[in-house]
């Protein structure tokens, strides 16, 4: 997938992406991901 920092830049807020556990610990794999800003668009959350 495209990495947004290459052309678009980062936006607040960050979102949490949770993936199913890849092991038998039963723990969700959650990571903070930046929302991607499209060039020329301004979003005021």
From Swiss-Prot:
Task: List the Gene Ontology MF annotations in alphabetical order.
Answer: potassium channel regulator activity; toxin activity
The protein's name is Myotoxin-2
Q: In which tissues is it expressed?
A: Expressed by the venom gland.
Q: Is Disulfide bond found in the keyword set? A: yes
Q: Where in the cell is it found?
A: Secreted
Which cystines does this chain contain?
Answer: 4-36, 11-30, 18-37
Signal peptide start and end residues: none
